[in-house]
């Protein structure tokens, strides 16, 4: 009896232990399910958050894209309006120039010298604004000048009646590199323009004279070119008819001085112009500033990068006689040569028949 009771007691204890283990396993499984459910809940929450942030990002990007597109359309509309204004202004200038031309009392053949174009340029530009005004000059590449304040008018400099004097003659006879000056309310010249006619290409500088203002290695480069040229002249010291030669210019200083004046590198002035411009004036108003551009080629002071291709300055020599048919003489190294003229010209003057030297 005692043995049976003892066996039942042991089996009961085993059953209790097994039941306890079963309950513990059940509890563990429940906790595992709870943990997995929590992880899934967190994953779903994070996914929802990610989707919401993605939607927000897409919405912001779309909003930005729409804003940029609206801005682009507005800028395009503005550009079209400005282009229409520019074309209307050009047409207005053309009509004004025709009126000026038709109002002349003298009906003789129109001269091709630069003075006529400069005179008309001044008349046209002065009819386009009421001063005092602030101007900024803008060249063909979009380079902008300093602000020029209190401009009331533009005037033709009397020295510009000389077509293309050398710098030495400019100084000696008050004939400046500048053709046109901007005048402020005190009557003082405050900005300077070298103007070229719209048609054709004019020389940058005559260098036939013996009193050149170049110095140092620049002077030596000019003289070296001259010596090379005259060595090609016959013994009679008469330059052959219709013979032209040219040579590239190495020195950027020579180019800048030929184009902008011999005071290049100093303050703007009559012999250090702010801008060289070709053709008629165009004025565009933005805010309180008037931006002056040209219908043709233009370059701000020092911007040699504008002078490429047909505008590149080169040494150039040609045959030349006076209007009366008399021989024109040039002195090189104390020797006089007939019908010979030295220039710094745009490369446009060079043809297939022009001989390159040096």
From Swiss-Prot:
Protein function: In the presence of ATP, there is a relaxation of its specificity and it can cleave 5'-RGCN-3' and 5'-YGCY-3', but not 5'-YGCR-3' (R.CviJI* activity).
Keyword Hydrolase: yes
Reactions performed catalytically: Endonucleolytic cleavage of DNA to give specific double-stranded fragments with terminal 5'-phosphates
Enzyme Commission number, as recorded: 3.1.21.4
Keywords of the record: Endonuclease, Hydrolase, Magnesium, Nuclease, Restriction system
First-tier enzyme category under EC: hydrolase
Cofactor: Mg(2+)
Protein name, entry field: Type II restriction enzyme CviJI
GO terms of molecular function: type II site-specific deoxyribonuclease activity
Residue pairs linked by disulfide bridges in the UniProt entry: none
Top-rank taxon: Viruses
Pfam family, one: DUF5401
An example Gene Ontology biological process: DNA restriction-modification system
């Amino acid at each position: 009896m005692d043995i049976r009771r003892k066996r039942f007691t042991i089996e009961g204890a085993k059953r209790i232990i097994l039941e306890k283990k079963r309950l513990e396993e059940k509890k563990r499984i429940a906790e595992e399910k709870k943990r997995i459910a929590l992880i899934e809940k967190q994953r779903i929450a994070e996914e929802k958050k990610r989707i919401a942030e993605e939607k927000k990002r897409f919405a912001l990007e779309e909003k930005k894209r729409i804003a940029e597109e609206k801005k682009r359309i507005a800028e395009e509309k503005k550009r079209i309006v400005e282009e229409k204004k520019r074309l209307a202004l050009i047409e207005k200038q053309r009509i004004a120039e025709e009126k000026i031309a038709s109002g002349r009392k003298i009906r003789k053949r129109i001269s091709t010298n630069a003075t006529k174009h400069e005179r008309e340029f001044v008349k046209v530009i002065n009819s386009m604004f009421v001063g005092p005004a602030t101007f900024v000059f803008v060249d063909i590449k979009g380079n902008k000048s300093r602000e020029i304040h209190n401009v009331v008018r533009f005037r033709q400099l009397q020295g510009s009646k000389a077509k293309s004097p050398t710098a030495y003659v400019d100084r000696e006879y008050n004939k400046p590199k500048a053709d046109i000056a901007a005048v402020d309310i005190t009557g003082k010249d405050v900005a300077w323009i070298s103007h070229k006619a719209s048609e054709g290409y004019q020389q940058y500088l005559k260098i036939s004279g013996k009193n050149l203002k170049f110095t140092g290695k620049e002077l030596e480069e000019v003289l070296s070119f001259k010596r090379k040229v005259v060595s090609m002249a016959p013994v009679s010291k008469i330059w052959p008819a219709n013979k032209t030669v040219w040579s590239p210019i190495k020195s950027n200083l020579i180019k800048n001085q030929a184009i902008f004046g011999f005071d290049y590198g100093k303050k703007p002035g009559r012999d250090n112009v702010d801008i060289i411009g070709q053709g008629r004036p165009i004025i565009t108003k933005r805010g309180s500033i008037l931006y002056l551009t040209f219908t043709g080629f233009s370059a701000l002071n020092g911007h040699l990068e504008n002078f490429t291709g047909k505008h590149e300055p080169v040494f150039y020599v040609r045959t030349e006689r006076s209007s009366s048919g008399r021989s024109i003489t040039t002195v090189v190294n104390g020797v006089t040569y007939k019908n010979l003229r030295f220039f710094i010209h745009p490369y446009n003057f060079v043809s297939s028949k022009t001989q390159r030297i040096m």
